[in-house]
Amino acid sequence: MSSESSTEGDSDLYDPLAEELHNVQLVKHVTRENIDALNAKFANLQEPPAMYLIEYQELTSKLHELEAKEQELMERLNSQDQQEDSSLVERFKEQPHYQNQTQILQQQRQLARVHHGNDLTDSLGSQPGSQCGTLTRQPKILLRAHLPNQQRTSVEVISGVRLCDALMKALKLRQLTPDMCEVSTTHSGRHIIPWHTDIGTLHVEEIFVRLLDKFPIRTHIKHQIIRKTFFSLVFCEGCRRLLFTGFYCSQCNFRFHQRCANRVPMLCQPFPMDSYYQLLLAENPDNGVGFPGRGTAVRFNMSSRSRSRRCSSSGSSSSSKPPSSSSGNHRQGRPPRISQDDRSNSAPNVCINNIRSVTSEVQRSLIMQARPPLPHPCTDHSNSTQASPTSTLKHNRPRARSADESNKNLLLRDAKSSEENWNILAEEILIGPRIGSGSFGTVYRAHWHGPVAVKTLNVKTPSPAQLQAFKNEVAMLKKTRHCNILLFMGCVSKPSLAIVTQWCEGSSLYKHVHVSETKFKLNTLIDIGRQVAQGMDYLHAKNIIHRDLKSNNIFLHEDLSVKIGDFGLATAKTRWSGEKQANQPTGSILWMAPEVIRMQELNPYSFQSDVYAFGIVMYELLAECLPYGHISNKDQILFMVGRGLLRPDMSQVRSDAPQALKRLAEDCIKYTPKDRPLFRPLLNMLENMLRTLPKIHRSASEPNLTQSQLQNDEFLYLPSPKTPVNFNNFQFFGSAGNI
């Protein structure tokens, strides 16, 4: 009898179904942790590797199988539990207190479900055979957090965990820290919650995280990547190696190699340097930050320049000894804010620049003032243009004037070296096939540290006046940097004039509209016009007139980003007669403004003439055809447009175009230049139109409205990068030549 009871007790202690269920739960927990680890490492990548997708599919399918197995075992355990309950009731039915035993059993099971959750319950009573278990899952309590920039996340409410620790992972992914933000229970930010608050004590379902005013961070969802050749010493921010030809974001200035594209952060978020400097100045307003006060002299103690320092100190002491002593006492009483090394790195040394940049002109000007012969060149900067051997100086103004003169000489020297850096030798450029020709030159695809576009100008033998005008305009073009402007990379002056620009992977707007007949949506059409107006507004802010804006000079990338090319260069776009400019119109006929056709003024090109050409481009987009298609005689078009007798037919504009967009195009092509708006109000109107169009609003954290499942075969036929290793793959390798 005792042996039978012992075997029954062992069978009650060891349940094979419960043991199997426990093992399945452990394997499912490990599988879920593997999936979370894979997602944390590869889910943020725009193009995850194929091995990650395969492993993710295998783990998810395995997880589904384990969940099905767990459900099956739980059903079997429940059925076995019911059978044991029925047998238990029959066994104790003869006893008078069996009803009380049944009630106690049910109460103990309910307590076991609450306290143990998914685990097996312990023994429920002292009676043998009363041990049985139920498996239930306790629901998780989540707290929704609204993050800055219209993003949100959810965290599990666990007692004992601080609020900053619960949100730390979400903040780090967005390059934020708790010091930059504050938490409140309302959207207005009235009820502030401390970061060290226990998350289990919060009695709200959602919280709001917003940035503090002293740390404004402009965040963009999408980077504006631009290919660039860096002529200065630049390092990749992904691998920290030297970067020569690569990419950078025009918004956050993140620079990287092509092979380091997977290290680019998901959010375009520039570092708030201006706010950081403002915060430093606000904390200590008396800090001079290296700027000397009025009547004080600046001392730079550098061991390598001790000789120049001795020369400058001797000259200044002989000319003005009392002010130097007072300033010295002032410096002894108040220590400097910034060390000498930091000052020498942040700004140029005035004494060193004066020594290095003393030219013959300054020496001649000093000799003309009947000064005694100088024993050493380093004493030039200490003497003033209005001082004499017998005069005394009351302040250090003459020294500042000599510093200004030396800075001018330094700027002239830097401008000369910078001009030489932008000049490209014709032997360095590998000319490829001819792409096209226009009214001012011919465009070739070429290779110069990467694919570039070379436009040889029609000015074959430039005169000195033409060459000087060309250099002046190149000096203006090399300062243009904008996301809607083709990047100017350099120029060639010998044997013929040519400019080197960024190569645009795409086709022109003219080809899209009139050759391929691409049907743009209305919001896409307005966005193209907005980008063109934005680029032209930037050029006009730089005092650059395009002179030949047309759909052939507007290029579209695959993502419909706009690049404006062939801007500026009035030297090449002007007819020359010997050493003088000829008074003849240049450009394309259909996009010429009436005042340009008439040529009644010496220089009829203005900002309004570019606005007229922009109006014709907008008419092409709206009507999907060229203006004046019913007239084949060019002279007739020139005469009628110049007299104001011919205007584009606005009845051919697409029917779904809003009236405001039609009025905008009509205002741009008005006959009188003063009646045409400039690009700044045009840009504002186009942005308002694009903002008021009905569209599907989507969250900033999920920019893609529909997420397509990536397949494994999408990663099998990726094109190889255009690097110098694959040099034989260039199309122009067989027909190489020089300018």
From Swiss-Prot:
Effects seen without this gene: RNAi-mediated knockdown in the prothoracic gland (PG) delays the onset of pupariation by prolonging the L3 larval stage.
Keyword set includes Cell cycle: no
Comp. bias (Polar residues): 380-393
Residue ranges that the Swiss-Prot or TrEMBL entry lists as coiled coil: 50-86
EC nos: 2.7.11.1
Composition-biased stretches (Basic and acidic residues): 401-410
Similarity annotation: Belongs to the protein kinase superfamily. TKL Ser/Thr protein kinase family. RAF subfamily.
Name of the molecule in the record: Raf homolog serine/threonine-protein kinase Raf
Source species: Drosophila melanogaster
